């Protein structure tokens, strides 16, 4: 059994945490986030740390309190450091560029793909083959990166497409004559 939930989440200086019922709110230098904890989990703020505990000794409650603790730790990291996902584009003629508040992707289709950047997310294009997705909410950052990758996922023969910077593409060999 994992013991992630037993460790309290320390709130660093410069971050204010409030617990109202089942809602945990964090406010820091990068912004404000909140998370609603499941009813099977007790949440308290004491001694500069947020503590979670299962309300009942059921398997579900024990699983949820570890998850709740990890989510609260993500709130703290988000409002202090933020989260970033890096994407790489591989392929001849494949490139990305910013067009106002939209991301323009040339991915081998007959048209360019325009991606509307959601609220709370910052996208930068340092090179035409690199995309950085930055934000304070890890779920939103991951979702945006996944949506961009889904426009042209990497294919296993030449590796062309949009991939995460740390992703390994299993390569296949072509047909034999």
UniProtKB/Swiss-Prot annotation:
Keywords, alphabetical: Ribonucleoprotein, Ribosomal protein, RNA-binding, rRNA-binding
Protein name: Large ribosomal subunit protein uL6
GO molecular function: rRNA binding; structural constituent of ribosome
PROSITE patterns: RIBOSOMAL_L6_1
Subunit structure: Part of the 50S ribosomal subunit.
GO cellular component, one term: cytosolic large ribosomal subunit
InterPro entries, per database record: Ribosomal_uL6-like, Ribosomal_uL6-like_a/b-dom_sf, Ribosomal_uL6_a/b-dom, Ribosomal_uL6_bac-type, Ribosomal_uL6_CS
Function comment: This protein binds to the 23S rRNA, and is important in its secondary structure. It is located near the subunit interface in the base of the L7/L12 stalk, and near the tRNA binding site of the peptidyltransferase center.
Family of the protein in this entry: Belongs to the universal ribosomal protein uL6 family.
HAMAP family linked to this entry: Ribosomal_uL6_B
Gene: rplF
PANTHER family: 60S/50S RIBOSOMAL PROTEIN L6/L9, LARGE RIBOSOMAL SUBUNIT PROTEIN UL6M
Gene Ontology BP, a term: cytoplasmic translation
Source organism per UniProt: Rhodopseudomonas palustris (strain ATCC BAA-98 / CGA009)
Pfam families cross-referenced by the UniProt entry: Ribosomal_L6
């Amino acid at each position: 059994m994992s013991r992630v939930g037993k460790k309290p989440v320390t709130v660093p200086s410069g971050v204010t945490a409030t617990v109202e019922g089942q809602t945990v709110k964090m406010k820091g230098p990068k912004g404000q986030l909140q998370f609603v904890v499941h009813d099977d989990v007790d949440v308290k703020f004491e001694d500069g740390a947020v503590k979670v505990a299962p309300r009942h000794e059921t398997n579900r409650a024990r699983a949820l309190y570890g998850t709740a603790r990890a989510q609260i730790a993500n709130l703290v990291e988000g409002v202090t450091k933020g989260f970033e996902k890096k994407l790489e584009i591989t392929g001849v003629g494949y490139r990305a560029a910013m067009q106002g508040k939209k991301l323009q992707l040339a991915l081998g289709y007959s048209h360019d793909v325009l991606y509307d950047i959601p609220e709370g997310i910052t996208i930068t294009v340092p090179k035409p083959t690199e995309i950085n997705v930055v934000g304070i909410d890890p779920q939103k950052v991951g979702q945006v990166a996944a949506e961009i990758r889904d426009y042209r996922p990497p294919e296993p023969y030449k590796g062309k497409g949009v991939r995460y910077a740390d992703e390994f593409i299993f390569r296949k060999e072509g047909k034999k004559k």
